[in-house]
């Protein structure tokens, strides 16, 4: 059947993770997968969907467009073509959207940001999602979301009952782990990273609150350290009140997936000042690489980041320092605290982070998701 990913075949835009399917099960599927995400740019949603696709048990029929489509044409394919190709089988849509005409469907909705803060998005994008999500959430059989925070916001914004939403947290890919000193040294040399650095990884858009980080960094102005911003530049730099980058700040651009663990492992501290996250992959990925984390205390982030690090308590399992995302002085204080931290404290924070991130694995996430899908497919 057209659009089915079978064993040994990998379409364009796929990463290097093997896809494990048994042909006999693919030929007689009970669950179809909305594979539109396979042709989209890699973000947290696409990372989740690909991780799930690589980990799930056999039995999925992956339906995707024949060729990569523009966003507008992708929406048309999803709404008009996908439900016909799926037929009566259960459809799982892992990337926030799905066809409105398909009631026998499970949708993974990662957050309610378009409903809570439409001003953060382009006009057309916000209008479409504000029209689609509440109607889709009320029509389909089940919603999966990735945090208790997102569940509460979806209940409030979409007017759906508690029992219709299952919370299944995301996971951290196994490639995020501490790398060797030799690999770090080679990476530093190739990218001319001569000083110790603090790191932010993510898109540079208003809700990520990078402008607050830049202002806190300007207040600190540490002479022996630089701030690395890894991600695509956006209109955050045109916000009123901020026009120039502080000294010792470097725009690193987009990081290749295979280099991201090294970039994280080599950092002095990872800083995540986001105003709104349905889950938040980057802090957990940094923890998994042994990098100390400073994180906003907003939305889902305390739920995902776990207990705060307590240097005075040897039994503390915390791996993160939190701050109010509107308080630049508090952020500057936390950065200074990590930079002045005794080596043993930093190592303890690092060990705690590796242990905490280990709780979020794809096998657990996939098994819980598969159980929910199979129960609905057989009922």
PLM ranges: what are they?
Residues 7:
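Cationic, low-complexity basic patches in intrinsically disordered or flexible, solvent-exposed regions
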Residues 10-379:
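Carbohydrate transferase catalytic cores enriched for Leloir-type hexosyltransferases
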């Amino acid at each position: 059947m057209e659009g089915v990913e079978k064993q040994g075949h990998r379409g364009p835009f796929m990463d290097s993770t093997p896809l494990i399917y048994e042909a006999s099960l693919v030929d007689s599927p009970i669950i179809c997968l909305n594979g539109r995400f396979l042709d989209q740019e890699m973000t947290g949603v696409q990372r989740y969907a690909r991780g799930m696709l690589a980990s799930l048990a056999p039995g999925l029929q992956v339906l995707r467009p024949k060729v990569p489509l523009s966003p507008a044409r992708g929406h048309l394919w999803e709404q008009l073509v996908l439900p016909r190709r799926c037929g009566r089988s259960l459809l799982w849509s892992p990337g926030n959207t799905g066809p409105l005409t398909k009631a026998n469907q499970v949708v993974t909705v990662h957050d309610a940001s378009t409903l809570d803060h439409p001003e953060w998005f382009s006009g057309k994008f916000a209008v479409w999602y504000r029209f689609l999500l509440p109607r889709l959430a009320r029509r389909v059989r089940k919603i999966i979301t990735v945090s208790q925070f997102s569940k509460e916001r979806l209940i409030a914004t979409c007017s759906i009952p508690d029992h219709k939403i299952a919370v299944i947290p995301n996971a951290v890919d196994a490639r995020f782990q501490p790398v060797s000193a030799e690999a770090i040294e080679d990476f530093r040399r190739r990218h001319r990273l001569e000083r110790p650095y603090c790191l932010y990884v993510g898109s540079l858009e208003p809700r990520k609150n990078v402008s607050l980080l830049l202002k806190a960094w300007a207040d600190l102005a540490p002479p022996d350290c630089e701030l690395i911003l890894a991600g695509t530049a956006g209109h955050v730099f045109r916000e009123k009140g901020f026009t120039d980058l502080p000294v010792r700040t470097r725009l690193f651009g987009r990081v290749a997936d295979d280099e991201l663990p090294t970039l994280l492992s080599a950092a002095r501290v990872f800083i995540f000042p986001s105003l709104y996250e349905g889950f938040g992959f980057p802090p957990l990925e940094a923890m998994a690489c042994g990098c100390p984390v400073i994180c906003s205390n907003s939305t889902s982030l305390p739920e995902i980041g776990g207990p705060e690090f307590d240097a005075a308590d040897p039994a503390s399992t915390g791996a993160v320092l939190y701050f109010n995302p509107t308080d630049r002085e508090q952020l500057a204080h936390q950065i200074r605290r990590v930079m002045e931290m005794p080596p043993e404290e930093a190592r303890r924070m690092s060990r705690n982070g590796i242990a905490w991130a280990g709780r979020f694995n794809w096998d657990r996430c996939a098994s819980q998701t598969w159980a929910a899908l199979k129960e609905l497919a057989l009922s």
